[in-house]
């Protein structure tokens, strides 16, 4: 082998293996399919504290606003006509209060801790490996403490009874309430997984569909269960009202089962690798649009290339018209 060939081989080997040892070479990592929003950094004590502070502030802000709005709605005179809290005006006001409160709270604290603000959502994120189990426990503690703090603050700042605690209504049984809470939470958690965890161009807008999903859940469930879908919300309100019904467990088991159900649906989509289908559909659509744009350009190119001929013909016709017109 010549010296030049030897040098080329050494250079190629250096490019592929900077260490010069084949066994120690580590290939580049594959790109992540999950969004980095919830992975603020490694699980150090400092970073756990940052996540805990972000979840506490975000959950407190979300639930305090929602509790106060809910209290105002339930103190309305319409409560006399609809003692179960099923008056449409109350339902819409409560749903808007919770939906918009979680929306702006997520937008504020998504860059700090991810903005889960809900133990059920945190469980879905942990199952999806968007956060570690340790981080999930830290978030749970912060969210539950923030829920109790928000309930106490809302109760202390507003006069009258505490009317934002969860309870069954319209003759809803515990079993029905459990399944309603489970499916309502599943819708919320699946929205989080599909809009915030999946890597998309619209991740920065994830707070909007999450808020809308919580709004829809409240419109659907409030008359029947009071809409928990968040154990921190249910516990904080129960502590503030000093009201723990014998069926309080459905506001914990239901949301946790819902978060597992949402993760199961999301995991099934990952196994089916739905992104390849979506990518193929987008590629086909882009190709079709490109072909449609090219077709109108063909007559234009013909006119441009034959402009001189067309000009000569039109000039001849014009002269003939003028000559015959004079005759």
UniProtKB/Swiss-Prot annotation:
One of its GO terms (molecular function) is water channel activity. Its main location: endoplasmic reticulum. Residues 70-91, 158-176, 225-248 are extracellular. The chain crosses the membrane at residues 49-69, 92-112, 137-157, 177-197, 204-224, 249-269. The keyword RNA-binding does not apply. SUPFAM superfamilies: Aquaporin-like. Keywords: Cell membrane, Endoplasmic reticulum, Membrane, Repeat, Transmembrane, Transmembrane helix, Transport. A motif (NPA 2) lies at residues 230-232. It is found in: Endoplasmic reticulum membrane; Cell membrane. InterPro entries: Aquaporin-like, Aquaporin_transptr, MIP, MIP_CS. One of its GO terms (cellular component) is plasma membrane. A motif (NPA 1) lies at residues 118-120. Residues 1-34 are annotated as: Disordered. Residues 1-48, 113-136, 198-203, 270-327 are cytoplasmic. Water channel required to facilitate the transport of water across membranes. Involved in sporulation, freeze tolerance and osmotolerance. Is non-functional in most laboratory strains. Belongs to the MIP/aquaporin (TC 1.A.8) family. Aquaporins contain two tandem repeats each containing three membrane-spanning domains and a pore-forming loop with the signature motif Asn-Pro-Ala (NPA). This is Aquaporin-1. It comes from Saccharomyces cerevisiae (strain Lalvin EC1118 / Prise de mousse).
């Amino acid at each position: 082998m010549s010296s030049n060939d030897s040098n080329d081989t050494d250079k190629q080997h250096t490019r592929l293996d900077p260490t010069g040892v084949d066994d120690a070479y580590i290939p580049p990592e594959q790109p992540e399919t999950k969004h980095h929003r919830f992975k603020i950094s490694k699980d150090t004590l400092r970073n756990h504290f940052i996540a805990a502070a972000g979840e506490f502030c975000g959950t407190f802000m979300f639930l305090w606003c929602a509790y106060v709005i809910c209290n105002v709605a339930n103190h309305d005179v319409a409560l006399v006509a609809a003692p179960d809290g099923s008056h449409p005006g109350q339902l819409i006001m409560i749903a808007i209060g919770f939906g918009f409160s979680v929306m702006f709270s997520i937008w504020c604290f998504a860059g700090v801790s991810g903005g889960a603000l809900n133990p059920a959502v945190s469980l879905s994120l942990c199952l999806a490996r968007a956060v570690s189990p340790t981080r999930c426990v830290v978030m749970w503690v912060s969210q539950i403490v923030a829920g109790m703090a928000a309930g106490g603050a809302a109760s202390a700042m507003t006069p009258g009874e505490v009317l934002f605690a969860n309870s069954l209504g319209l003759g809803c049984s515990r079993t029905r309430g459990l399944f309603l809470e489970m499916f309502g939470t599943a819708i919320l958690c699946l929205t989080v997984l599909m809009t915030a965890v999946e890597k998309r161009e619209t991740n920065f807008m994830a707070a909007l569909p999450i808020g809308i999903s919580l709004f829809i859940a409240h419109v659907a469930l409030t008359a029947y269960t009071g809409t928990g879908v968040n154990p921190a919300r249910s516990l904080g309100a129960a502590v503030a009202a000093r009201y723990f019904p014998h069926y309080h467990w459905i506001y914990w088991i239901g949301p946790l089962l819902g978060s597992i159900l949402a993760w199961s649906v999301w995991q099934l989509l990952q196994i089916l690798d739905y992104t390849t289908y979506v990518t193929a559909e987008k590629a086909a659509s882009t190709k079709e649009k490109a072909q449609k744009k090219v077709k109108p350009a063909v007559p234009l190119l013909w006119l441009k290339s034959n402009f001189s001929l067309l000009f000569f013909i039109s000039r001849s016709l014009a002269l003939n018209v003028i000559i015959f017109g004079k005759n």
